[in-house]
């Protein structure tokens, strides 16, 4: 590099000062490199620009170790120069930063700001520095290129007043632009989210972490990884914080948090508000931890009746980690349930309809991310606006401003995946770069041209095409994007709009194809990778359009807004109450927020300077004359105009998308930068390499950036024209103190001055009215003294002089700024020396500092509400008194029983341990517990009766008869028992222990099963004390076994082994106690029982001269004693002593057994005159010598009773089943019913079923073989909800199936619903038409419950019972002629005037579920049953499973469904009292056939079934668990003379639950509702039958069987045990009976040839424990599992209860009602008025009160109207081929006509759907016999029209002429007259 003189070339800091041959990209790069390598990483573009290279080390040290030559030094120098211009010229100063991410923009910006603030060392300057730090903390992040990447556009404004040369800082303003919100939920790999989140996690104390839930005690598993984290926070993976390694990237987060809190405190944020900010930040982190899974909504909601076709509950998304959810809810001041609801649902606007989408787990995760993103965006906006409110000065006091503009760097790809963020930031960079080019090239050129000064032109890259293409209002790319968003267009439509606008019109924008052709295919498909390309100044970028339109909408769902309305946190309410949140209200109800949008532009605008220079203003006005018309001014935020603009309605409800808002904010910046009194400086930040290596210069990398920013062209331009100041001649001459003595014009004088100054021509030129100067030249004449010294302390680059260090005159007064050296707040730029950060002087705010220190040293949440208190507060509902209800006496009695049973459970324990805060919930739990106690007591009683009671009556005896003993002979698998002296022992167990061991066991086993007493002779004297206490040892007593069976195997006294056990006195080995000892041992170890003798057999033995009798249930035998068994024997060698008394037993005892042989001698024994000693001695002798067994009472009467009681129970159960079997044997052919003419309604309630299920149900109902014109298909859609797996809301699916066009949009009408408080007011839409399927043309009506405008989540949804009540209440009011709601009047109008049937004609209603398929002959068979039996009020058919083989769960249910219908319902049908008519397939009689009295829709049924106050456990089980069964109960209760029956010939197929959870929930509903409904039925007196044959007895048995179902399993298990252990015939008989049960069932399905049921029966039997044990126990304990809603009861005065609700109080008057006659009169009047003006028959709708042409019922006639419509199911040509009208009955009409006139079917009603061709008028009026026939009227109308003036004739005039001719009132023929007139005039007749 060349040198100039002795000064090295690299010392030249100003690039324009380089020679011309060095003004290229390559040479400039080389020059920057030479400076970089000598630690001079900066350069200048004269006075207008600064170039800084990031050294990745310190930005505060230059080549000499001080700041001179560093980025910090250059920033300070630039600030001094701008400060001088601000003070001396009163110009606004603006600094625009350019640079890619990682170029160090944020650091240089902080140095620049610190320099300006140091000029005004006041507390305000400190606050403004802290404000910038807070902004960076909230909006910067660490990326792969830098640790301080800015992710929001910044416009920082310093405000000054007007004061001579030293402006006073009076305020500041932070304007944030488009925060990169997507980073919150999608942290790129290797990057971080916003710093403040890491600060919070690292900087909080242990107590604060505990409060915020950030400690390790919350067990959280990272979604998708399955890795559970340990208790340490540092090892827990936070989803919103990226990879855990990002928490250790060299940033001191803990210190950053302390700085952040200090900054907020010094900015005057209250302590409580800082705590609230931290709680919201913690809530955001916890939202990221929420894990979602798929579950079942098994708890019935408070306003729902549950089931629909989903009998056990619908599939919903649930939060798995509810502890984390509770933390989020607590910090947001919300209820846990409310928060979960809002996360699982999302409401959208589709075709102007609000629709709630039931989200899957992915959708719920995205919804949670949206909540987190919205929270963070609003929090940032709130903090910034709060700062602005504290530091911003009043607009009218601001004289000048210094603005710093810093937007995120240009990006060629989106790291977070947000294309919109990338597009908007790049557009901002494009606009700011264009402003730079315009300022340097165009603005100067315009000024010079206006002064007729010519300079050489400089070529440069002009990005105007890109700027116009992107930013032009009206038809720029961003404007088009916003327009397409507001119109609700798709991405493809947006792309096509871009094509039309830019193709071949703007070379900067290229639009890709919206379609693509796959290889091997000739058909174009949608291009999923469709994109457009923008040629930016920094290069071409492709922008995919996928989801771009939706992302631009930036919509916050109405569910979230509706949820936040209920927050108990004032801070959160303030967040969502900001002006930054643009809300969209429902057009019909302004208080209902449909959706919202977080603003992408700041809440404030740049200040408008009040001080202008006249010359500049003049020049600006000249330029304006040549410029296009200005764009419309954006209204100031917060003004009324802005509010009005925000509320303009659009297709999507949005007024502006993110693009339009950003574009508006960008316009404000551009206007601010290009204002006449603004001097701009441009700072270009470059990164020396892409790898963030310190002190390494990559020439290629830098050259690309130099080329990108056009630095060479800018430098060349400044070499020819470096003019930034224009001075009029007078001002210029005044500054230069030109000699007044010089004669000449001012121009000449100025020229002389210029000549004398020797300024180069590129820095000083003279114009027509003034002088153009560079900033350096101006400073040399304008600044004096210290100002000049300060300014020239750093030279700006004279061509002849290199930079020299200068003195800083502000160093004495400037406050040194403190920072940190570790890359944390204060300075984010390598290891900064203390001095260049955000934080101002410690001395300036010592008081605030001390307060902050005290604040962050402890627990910021001390003395604030705890997390638990916040949770309780959030769950508490705001309630108001809505009703006072009395407490019934029965309820009081029941509660008394409940508290008697649960008194030992204190209320506080239930409250705190059970978590039940509400009194009514605790009461319900007590009721549940009491009911369970009663159930368990009942089960215990049954167990006692079955098992314990028989044992009490007949205690178990361990006795063995001879036969039983013989069976234990040890052969085969039999055990080996042996009897010795009446005792039975286990020989098998004894044999291994026999002594001596040498005796083989085979020798011992021969004694098995026999009485071996003979083997064991006894020593009498050892076992008996005799009469006087001693028996001579020589006395012997032989033992002769009692023949107890006649064939007993008895061991004789001659047995060979006897001698081995003979140890009597006379033997050689006398052991008198041996036998006694052996017996003690045997009894202790081997005894099994005793030999048993029945009393009858004892008597038999006595008859055989046996001296045997019973004493105390023990049998003693004196036969041997009496018959010579006594003897006297002495040992060998000894003489037998004489006089030995062998009568050792008392004679009284002997006589007693001899004389009373065969009897029980107990009472005689007790009467013997024996002294106690003798009696005791005799008893001892009896037991040891004469005992042979015990009394066997097993066949006694009481034991037989105990035994057969089990059999009796089995017989009783089997008898009931037997009756059911005979009831099921309904043989006979399927009688084909006669042609029926009754009108039938088929109602299908729809909720979230899929299209296939709905189509099957609707098609099956339409295809039923029943007269189509007498069927009416009514589908009631419960809410605007998109079910999981569906792509459209359920009503739209139904309407698409029925062929209704999307253009048909009736007005929603009010009606009453079942709900809490204001939810009783609902709104619905009515559609009607004809549905054609497989040759059937069926009229239909669809009622869609859409909800009031104020309903955001699940609008209109009220549950299945409410869907039933819509039709039932309507028919009730029709039959009772009661005033109707608008919706009901519209339904009446549709059915009567459009479909053509009087609603009173419908006699029967068939209710099916939306997933039920009915057999074609179902309706005919049910109607036939009604006609055969006029006392029948309801019938059900057999329902089978259509998904029988889906899973084992469904397989278990197949057989159960079958027997529940063919046994239970068939049996109940015998009594005419089927206790449960299933809602999935039942037909009801609407009115009595003879009298027309309403039955199904009677007053009592409607009143009880529409009960809204469902606040007790009993009522909830009735109405929320089993509404179908309760409806049947009401029918039996109020219409006891009518019957309910089961018809097995009518078939339907439904879907059963296929998962355990849904199945258990379904059965919980069924079991509990069964119990509560049977309790309702038992007290009824009207149930038929008498005694045990009454239905009440059967109901009681059903209730008992339901309650004690678990015992049945125990009973069967008990029988199995009995059968296994006893060979008795009784349990075997019981099993035979139980087998007969299934045998009878088998007979049923065999006779009906249901062979497959054999297999299903086996599956059912295997599942018996589940059905009879598991499910009942689960159901009983979960009897109180409900979503209790927000209505509750509290105890009031005088025994009354007050009903409280947070849904508001419903006023019935809010829904207008009107009788049909009044409404019909209005129709006629309106029609007559229009008839006078128009010759056209009209239809008139309550919903619109508008004139609508009536269409044909054949279809197509209503497709173009707003309200009335028919499905265009068939074409006209198809219809005209029918020889007779479809609904015609032939009565009086010309049958030769091919088709009817358009209104003939609707207007006359003369033959539409009437029995036997009769008209509505024929059926209703009795005075029409004198009216002329239709043919007579037709002939007269033709005659009148033949002579009438067709220009003046009206239908009213024709009617009046006909009345004159026939002399009769023809009001009832008005419609026919009109339709006939129309037909004649149109040529159809």
UniProtKB/Swiss-Prot annotation:
One of its GO terms (molecular function) is cytoskeletal motor activity. ATP binds at residues 99-106. Glycans are attached at residues 219, 429, 668, 1043, 1068, 1462, 1568, 1759, 1790. It is found in: Cell membrane; Membrane. Its EC number is 2.4.1.16. CDD domains: MYSc_Myo17 (cd14879). Residues 1-789 form the Myosin motor domain. Disruption phenotype: Leads to hyperpigmentation and loss of viability in stationary phase at 37 degrees Celsius. Reduces the virulence in a mouse model of acute infection. Causes cell wall integrity defects and subsequent abnormal yeast morphology at 37 degrees Celsius. Does dot lead to compensation by increased expression of another chitin synthase genes. SUPFAM superfamilies: Cytochrome b5-like heme/steroid binding domain (SSF55856), DEK C-terminal domain (SSF109715), Nucleotide-diphospho-sugar transferases (SSF53448), P-loop containing nucleoside triphosphate hydrolases (SSF52540). Residues 609-621 have a biased composition (Basic residues). Induction: The expression level increases quickly and almost doubles when cells were shifted to 37 degrees Celsius, compared to cells maintained at 25 degrees Celsius. Expression is also increased under additional stress conditions that are known to initiate development of the sclerotic morphology (acidic conditions or Ca(2+) limitation induced by EGTA) or of hyphae (induced by nitrogen limitation). At least one negative regulator binding sequence exists in the promoter between -880 and -680 bp and another regulatory binding site is localized between bp -680 and -450 bp. Residues 666-690 are annotated as: Actin-binding. It comes from the Eukaryota. It catalyses: [(1->4)-N-acetyl-beta-D-glucosaminyl](n) + UDP-N-acetyl-alpha-D-glucosamine = [(1->4)-N-acetyl-beta-D-glucosaminyl](n+1) + UDP + H(+). Gene3D superfamilies: 1.10.10.820, 1.20.58.530, Cytochrome b5-like heme/steroid binding domain, Homeodomain-like, Kinesin motor domain, Myosin VI head, motor domain, U50 subdomain, Spore Coat Polysaccharide Biosynthesis Protein SpsA, Chain A. Maximal activity requires trypsin activation, suggesting a zymogenic nature. Residues 601-649, 794-817 are annotated as: Disordered. The chain crosses the membrane at residues 894-914, 929-949, 1205-1225, 1599-1619, 1626-1646, 1653-1673. GO terms for biological process: chitin biosynthetic process; fungal-type cell wall organization. Residues 1827-1882 form the DEK-C domain. Pfam families: Chitin_synth_2, Cyt-b5, DEK_C, Myosin_head. InterPro entries: Chitin_synth, Cyt_B5-like_heme/steroid-bd, Cyt_B5-like_heme/steroid_sf, DEK_C, Kinesin_motor_dom_sf, Myosin_head_motor_dom-like, MYSc_Myo17, Nucleotide-diphossugar_trans. Contains an N-terminal myosin motor-like domain with a P-loop (MMD) that is involved in the actin-dependent localization to the regions of cell wall growth. In the N-terminal section; belongs to the TRAFAC class myosin-kinesin ATPase superfamily. Myosin family. Polymerizes chitin, a structural polymer of the cell wall and septum, by transferring the sugar moiety of UDP-GlcNAc to the non-reducing end of the growing chitin polymer. CHS5 is required for the sustained growth at 37 degrees Celsius and is of critical importance for virulence. Especially important at infection temperatures for maintaining the cell wall integrity of developing yeast buds, elongating tips of hyphae, and random sites of expansion in sclerotic forms. This is Chitin synthase 5. The lineage of its organism: Eukaryota, Fungi, Dikarya, Ascomycota, Pezizomycotina.
């Amino acid at each position: 590099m060349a040198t100039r003189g002795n000064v090295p070339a690299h010392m030249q800091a100003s690039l324009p000062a380089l020679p011309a041959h060095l003004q290229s990209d390559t040479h400039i790069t080389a020059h920057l490199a030479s400076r970089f390598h000598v630690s001079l990483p900066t350069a200048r573009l004269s006075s207008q620009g600064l170039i800084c290279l990031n050294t990745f080390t310190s930005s505060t040290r230059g080549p000499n170790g001080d700041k001179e030559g560093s980025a910090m030094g250059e920033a300070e120098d630039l600030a001094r120069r701008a400060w001088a211009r601000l003070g001396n010229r009163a110009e606004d100063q603006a600094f625009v930063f350019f640079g890619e991410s990682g170029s160090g923009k944020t650091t240089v910006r902080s140095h620049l700001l610190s320099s300006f603030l140091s000029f005004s060392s006041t507390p305000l300057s400190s606050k403004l520095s802290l404000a910038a730090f807070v902004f960076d903390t909230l909006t910067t992040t660490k990326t792969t290129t830098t640790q301080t990447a800015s992710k929001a556009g910044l416009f920082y404004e310093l405000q000054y007043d007007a004061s001579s040369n030293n402006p006073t800082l009076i305020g500041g303003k932070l304007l944030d632009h488009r925060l990169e919100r997507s980073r919150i939920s999608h942290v790129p790999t290797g990057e971080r989210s916003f710093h403040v989140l890491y600060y919070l996690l690292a900087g909080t104390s242990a107590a604060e972490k505990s409060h915020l839930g950030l400690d390790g005690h919350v067990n959280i598993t990272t979604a998708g990884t399955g890795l559970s984290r340990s208790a340490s926070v540092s090892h827990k993976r936070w989803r919103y914080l990226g990879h855990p390694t990002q928490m250790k990237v060299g940033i001191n987060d803990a210190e950053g948090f302390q700085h952040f809190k200090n900054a907020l405190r010094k900015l005057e944020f209250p302590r409580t508000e800082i705590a609230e900010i931290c709680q919201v930040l913690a809530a955001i982190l916890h939202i990221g931890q929420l894990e979602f899974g798929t579950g079942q909504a098994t708890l019935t909601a408070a306003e729902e009746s549950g089931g629909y076709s989903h009998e056990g509950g619908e599939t919903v998304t649930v939060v798995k980690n509810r502890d984390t959810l509770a933390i989020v809810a607590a910090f947001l001041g919300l209820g846990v349930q409310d928060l979960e609801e809002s996360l699982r649902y999302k409401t959208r606007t589709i075709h102007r309809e609000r629709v709630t989408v039931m989200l899957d787990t992915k959708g719920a995760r995205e919804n949670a991310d949206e909540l987190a993103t919205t929270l963070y965006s609003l929090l940032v906006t709130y903090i910034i606006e709060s700062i602005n409110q504290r530091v911003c000065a009043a607009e009218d006091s601001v004289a000048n401003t210094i603005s710093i503009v810093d937007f995120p760097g240009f990006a060629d790809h989106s790291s977070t995946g947000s294309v919109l963020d990338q597009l908007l930031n790049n557009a901002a960079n494009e606009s700011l770069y264009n402003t730079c080019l315009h300022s340097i090239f165009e603005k100067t050129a315009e000024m010079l041209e206006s002064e007729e000064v010519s300079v050489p032109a400089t070529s440069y890259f002009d990005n105007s095409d890109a700027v116009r293409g992107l930013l032009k209002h009206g038809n720029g790319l961003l404007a088009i994007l916003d327009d397409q968003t507001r119109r609700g267009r798709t991405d493809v439509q947006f792309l096509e709009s871009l094509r039309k606008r830019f193709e071949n019109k703007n070379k900067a924008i290229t639009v890709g194809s919206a379609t693509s052709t796959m290889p091997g295919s000739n058909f174009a498909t949608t291009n999923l990778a469709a994109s457009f390309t923008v040629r930016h100044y920094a290069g071409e970028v492709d922008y995919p359009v996928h989801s771009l339109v939706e992302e631009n909408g930036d919509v916050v769902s109405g569910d979230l807004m509706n949820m936040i309305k209920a927050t108990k946190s004032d801070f959160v309410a303030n967040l969502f109450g900001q002006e930054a949140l643009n809300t969209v209200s429902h057009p019909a109800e302004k208080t209902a927020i449909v959706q919202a949008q977080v603003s992408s532009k700041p809440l404030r605008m740049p200040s408008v300077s009040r001080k202008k220079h006249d010359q500049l203003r003049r020049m600006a006005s000249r330029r304006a004359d040549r410029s296009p018309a200005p764009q419309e001014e954006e209204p100031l935020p917060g003004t009324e105009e802005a509010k009005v603009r925000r509320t303009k309605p659009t297709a999507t409800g949005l007024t502006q998308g993110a693009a339009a808002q950003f574009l508006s904010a960008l316009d404000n910046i551009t206007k601010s930068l290009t204002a006449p009194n603004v001097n701009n400086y441009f700072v270009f930040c470059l990164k020396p390499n892409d790898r963030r290596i310190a002190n390494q210069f990559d020439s290629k990398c830098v050259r690309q950036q130099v080329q990108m920013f056009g630095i060479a062209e800018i430098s060349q331009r400044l070499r020819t024209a470096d003019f930034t100041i224009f001075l009029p001649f007078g001002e210029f001459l005044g500054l230069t103190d030109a000699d007044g003595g010089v004669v000449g014009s001012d121009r000449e004088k100025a020229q002389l001055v210029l000549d004398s100054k020797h300024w180069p021509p590129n820095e000083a030129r003279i114009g027509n009215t003034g002088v153009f100067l560079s900033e350096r030249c101006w400073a040399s004449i304008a600044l004096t003294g210290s100002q000049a010294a300060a300014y020239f302390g750093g030279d700006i680059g004279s061509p002849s002089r290199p930079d020299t260090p200068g003195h800083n005159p502000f160093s004495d007064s400037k406050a040194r700024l403190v920072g940190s050296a570790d890359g944390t707040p204060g300075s984010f730029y390598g290891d900064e020396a203390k001095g260049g950060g955000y934080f101002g002087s410690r001395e300036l705010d010592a008081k605030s500092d001390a307060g902050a220190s005290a604040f962050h040293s402890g627990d910021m949440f001390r003395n604030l509400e705890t997390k638990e208190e916040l949770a309780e507060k959030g769950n508490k509902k705001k309630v108001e008194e809505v009703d006072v209800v009395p407490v019934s006496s029965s309820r009081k009695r029941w509660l008394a029983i409940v508290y008697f049973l649960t008194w030992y459970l204190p209320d506080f324990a239930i409250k705190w341990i059970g978590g039940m805060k509400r009194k009514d919930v605790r009461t319900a739990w007590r009721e549940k517990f009491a009911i369970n106690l009663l159930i368990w007591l009942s089960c215990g009683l049954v167990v006692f009766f079955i098992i314990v009671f028989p044992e009490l009556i007949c205690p178990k005896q361990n006795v063995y008869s001879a036969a039983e003993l013989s069976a234990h002979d040890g052969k085969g698998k039999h055990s080996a028992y042996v009897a010795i002296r009446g005792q039975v022992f286990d020989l098998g167990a004894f044999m291994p222990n026999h002594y001596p061991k040498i005796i083989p066991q085979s020798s011992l086993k021969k004694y098995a099963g026999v009485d071996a007493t003979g083997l064991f002779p006894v020593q009498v004297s050892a076992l008996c004390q005799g009469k006087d206490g001693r028996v001579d040892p020589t006395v012997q007593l032989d033992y002769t076994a009692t023949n107890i069976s006649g064939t007993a195997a008895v061991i004789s006294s001659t047995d060979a082994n006897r001698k081995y056990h003979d140890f009597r006195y006379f033997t050689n080995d006398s052991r008198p106690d041996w036998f006694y000892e052996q017996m003690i041992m045997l009894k202790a170890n081997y005894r099994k029982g005793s030999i048993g003798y029945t009393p009858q057999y004892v008597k038999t033995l006595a008859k055989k001269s046996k001296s045997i009798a019973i004493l105390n249930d023990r049998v003693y035998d004196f036969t041997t004693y009496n018959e010579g068994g006594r003897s006297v024997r002495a040992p060998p060698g000894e003489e037998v002593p004489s006089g030995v008394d062998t009568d050792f037993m008392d004679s009284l005892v002997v006589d007693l057994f001899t004389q009373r042989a065969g009897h029980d001698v107990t009472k005689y024994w007790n009467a013997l005159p024996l002294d106690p000693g003798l009696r005791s001695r005799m008893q001892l002798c009896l037991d040891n010598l004469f005992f042979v067994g015990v009394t066997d009472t097993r066949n006694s009467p009481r034991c037989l009773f105990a035994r057969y009681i089990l059999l009796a129970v089995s017989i009783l159960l089997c008898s009931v089943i037997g009756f059911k079997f005979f009831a099921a044997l309904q043989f006979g052919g399927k009688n084909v019913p006669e042609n029926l003419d009754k009108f039938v309604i088929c109602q299908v309630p729809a909720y979230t079923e899929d299209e296939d299920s709905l189509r099957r149900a609707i098609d099956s109902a339409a295809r039923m073989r029943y007269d189509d014109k007498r069927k009416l298909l009514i589908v009631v859609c419960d809410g605007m909800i998109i079910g999981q797996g569906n792509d459209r809301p359920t009503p739209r699916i139904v309407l698409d199936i029925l062929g209704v066009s999307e253009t048909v949009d009736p007005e929603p009408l009010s009606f009453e619903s079942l709900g809490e408080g204001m939810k009783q007011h609902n709104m619905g839409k009515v559609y009607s038409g004809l549905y054609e399927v497989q040759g059937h043309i069926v009229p239909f009506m669809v009622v869609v419950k859409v909800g009031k405008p104020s309903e955001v989540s699940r609008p209109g949804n009220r549950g299945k019972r409410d869907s039933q009540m819509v039709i039932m209440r309507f028919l009730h009011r029709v039959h009772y002629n009661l005033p109707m709601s608008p919706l009901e009047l519209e339904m009446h109008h549709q059915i009567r005037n459009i479909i053509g049937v009087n609603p009173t004609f419908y006699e029967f209603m068939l209710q099916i579920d939306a997933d039920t398929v009915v057999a074609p002959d179902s309706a005919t068979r049910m109607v036939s049953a009604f006609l055969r039996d006029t006392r029948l009020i309801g019938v059900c058919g057999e329902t089978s499973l259509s998904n029988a083989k889906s899973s084992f769960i469904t397989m278990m249910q197949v057989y159960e469904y079958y027997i529940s219908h063919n046994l239970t319902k068939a049996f109940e049908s015998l009594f005419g009292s089927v206790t449960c008519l299933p809602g999935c397939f039942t037909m009801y009689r609407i009115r009595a056939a003879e009298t027309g009295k309403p039955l199904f829709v009677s007053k009592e049924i409607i009143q009880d079934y529409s009960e809204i106050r469902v606040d007790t456990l009993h009522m909830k089980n009735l109405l929320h668990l089993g509404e179908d069964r309760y409806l049947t109960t009401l029918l039996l209760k109020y219409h006891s003379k009518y019957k309910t029956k089961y018809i097995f010939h009518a078939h339907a197929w439904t879907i059963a639950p296929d998962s355990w959870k849904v199945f258990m929930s379904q059965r919980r509903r069924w079991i509990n509702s069964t119990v509560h409904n049977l309790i309702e039925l038992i007290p009824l007196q009207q149930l038929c039958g008498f005694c045990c044959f009454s239905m009440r007895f059967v109901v009681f048995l059903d209730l008992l069987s339901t309650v004690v179902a678990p015992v049945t399993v125990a009973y069967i298990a008990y029988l199995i045990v009995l059968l296994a252990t006893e060979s008795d015939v009784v349990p075997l008989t019981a099993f035979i009976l139980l087998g007969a049960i299934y045998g009878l069932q088998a007979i049923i399905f065999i006779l009906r040839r249901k062979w497959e049921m054999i297999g299903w029966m086996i599956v059912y039997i295997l599942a018996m424990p589940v059905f009879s044990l598991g499910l009942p126990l689960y159901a009983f304990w979960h009897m109180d599992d409900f979503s209790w809603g927000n209505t509750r009861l509290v105890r009031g005065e005088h025994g009354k209860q007050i009903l409280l609700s947070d849904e508001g109080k419903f006023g019935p008057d809010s829904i207008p009602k009107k009788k049909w006659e009044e409404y019909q009169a209005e129709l006629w009047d309106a029609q007559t008025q229009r008839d006078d003006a128009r010759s056209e028959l009209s239809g008139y709708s309550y919903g619109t009160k508008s004139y609508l042409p009536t269409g044909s019922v054949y279809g197509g006639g209503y497709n173009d109207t707003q309200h009335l419509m028919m499905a265009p199911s068939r074409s006209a040509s198809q219809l005209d081929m029918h020889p007779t009208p479809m609904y015609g009955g032939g009565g009086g009409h010309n049958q030769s006509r091919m088709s009817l006139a358009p209104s003939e079917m609707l207007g006359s009603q003369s033959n539409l759907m009437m029995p036997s061709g009769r008209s509505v008028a024929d059926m209703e009026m009795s005075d029409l016999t004198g009216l002329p026939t239709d043919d007579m009227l037709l002939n007269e109308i033709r005659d009148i029209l033949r002579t009438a003036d067709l220009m003046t004739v009206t239908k009213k005039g024709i009617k009046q002429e006909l009345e004159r001719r026939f002399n009769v009132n023809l009001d009832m023929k008005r419609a026919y007259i009109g339709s006939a007139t129309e037909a004649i005039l149109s040529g159809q007749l």
